């Protein structure tokens, strides 16, 4: 695992790890750039602490640190901390204070993330051998070169980790994820969206045996995003549900192998879910909606977009039992009619956001039920609803004064109707395809 471009000194030091001529550590507010002439390789530039003091306007960072008044929410990001460490010896010591390293954020498709994590965690472990007690968040989304080795570094060195985002890192596998959730008992937020090799979330065999007093064989994750984990099946979802019983937010978008049976397992164990997305799960039907309805008033957010097997029957289950629903995305559910919208409007009166685009059987009648019952509606999408006319829109605008977003693209709506909406809902942004209205 040697790297000819690695320049290592005997003194532990800050590292800037990035591909040449491209951003390294990213946070949306700037990035470091390489001064190395080496090309075609990911460069890890390692520096010893500067021997002299330099005068710099950023000295206020030192005074804040000395007074221990630094605001945690305003801590410098990864790239800036590494740059600060190169100013002088005093700043070097300040920049590597573990209290400043609550978060590590790395981005870039070509960055050697495994090496970066190894160097960073090694330096942050100087005061507390082998562990980074202050590190709570690691975000390495989109880093395609991240492998199981990098995740194992996190699992070994970050026992206090609470948030991990590795979306789009398609080289990581189940084993690495098992290590993280087993060795980081405080982990609450996990994003593995786009990690196509991840098919399950569970404890390692060793953790199940040795750490049962600590875990109770449970994982403390509350937020789990498995969007685009195409290989996830009902059996894997069963295992996830059995181990992650504290889940409140679960996103299974485009997990195309999930069926109603998987949702049945989920509702047996995870009874505290507030937000759930099964959009584009084509095997989910009205029977799955019956299972989801068991969440009752706890459910606030539900996305069933493009689940073509769901009809008014499934909507009726949700409307009857999930009365506190605030958000529903049913775009592309072509089996939903005005009857389904009626059930929804009369029972979920606190609905704030509704997407029934591409539901050709929904007409002005359904809109009238919405207008007369859901006065708090703020966002409404009717895109490509062929049966909607200007009359239905006018009824909505006359009753839902707080409407802030209306999508009527590809709908047969007149200019007069759009002007009526704009006149009554002054803060409403209208998305349309009528060139005569502006």
Model-derived features: positions:
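A structural signal for leucine-rich repeat
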Residues: 118-123, 151-157, 177-184, 200-217, ...
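F-box-proximal linker/hinge
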Residues: 47, 55, 59, 106-157
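CRL adaptor-proximal regions
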Residues: 1-68, 437-438
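Short helix-loop-helix/strand-helix junction enriched in hydrophobic and basic residues
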Residues: 81-98
